[in-house]
């Protein structure tokens, strides 16, 4: 994709300057499609990249177009200060922000498309102690687990129906991580984790057996249990 760019002396010069990290480089005269191609070429090989624009609408447009170049691109929208806490369940904005933060915490390559407003919002990344990790054969205390999940922003329910909820009944723990398409089901024998699997929310049927899982907070800041 960047072979044609490499033939341009100007591109080679700009790439060298940007890799030196000395000051700001300003480019002009490119149409939108050329801008994204240039961004991809100049940042090729970098593990972390951030594309900042002026509005969520423009960020969404860039995100959709940039997916052609980079499968690791993710959208990080700004908070809606009025409606942000109104309904955590199924909230696309919250899910997109949490998924992006998760990828950063996991240290995976990512290109983040965001806005000035989103960057200006104070944000604290989670620490290892803010995350729940468990595996088959490990141990879990139901009472302590429930307290931690509530502290992480999860809502306790009789039966899990939407992302951000969890339930504990009869040695079975269901958790619907906000960043996953399907919830997890953990079966306990006493405090021993006997099995872990993902399951379908409607049919309740198992989808995949899992060796281990990582559960991330639903909220950005939370009380630590």
Could you describe each region identified by the protein language model?
Residues 1-224:
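ASCE RecA-like P-loop NTPase motor cores
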């Amino acid at each position: 994709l960047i072979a044609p760019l490499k033939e341009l002396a100007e591109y080679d010069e700009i790439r060298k300057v940007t890799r030196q990290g000395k000051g700001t480089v300003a480019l002009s005269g490119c149409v939108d499609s050329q801008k994204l191609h240039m961004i991809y070429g100049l940042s090729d090989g970098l593990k972390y990249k951030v594309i900042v624009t002026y509005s969520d609408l423009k960020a969404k447009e860039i995100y959709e177009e940039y997916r052609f170049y980079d499968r690791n691109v993710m959208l990080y929208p700004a908070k809606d200060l009025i409606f942000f806490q109104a309904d955590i369940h199924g909230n696309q904005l919250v899910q997109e922000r949490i998924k992006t933060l998760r990828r950063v915490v996991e240290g995976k390559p990512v290109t983040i498309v965001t806005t000035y407003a989103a960057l200006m919002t104070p944000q604290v990344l989670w620490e290892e102690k803010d995350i729940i990790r468990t595996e088959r054969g490990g141990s879990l205390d139901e009472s302590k687990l429930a307290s931690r999940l509530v502290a992480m922003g999860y809502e306790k329910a009789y039966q899990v129906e939407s992302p951000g909820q969890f339930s504990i009944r009869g040695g079975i723990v269901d958790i619907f991580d906000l960043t996953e398409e399907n919830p997890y089901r953990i079966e306990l024998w006493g405090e021993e984790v006997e099995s872990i699997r993902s399951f379908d929310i409607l049919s309740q049927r198992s989808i995949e057996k899992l060796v281990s899982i990582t559960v991330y907070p639903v909220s950005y800041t939370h009380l630590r249990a």
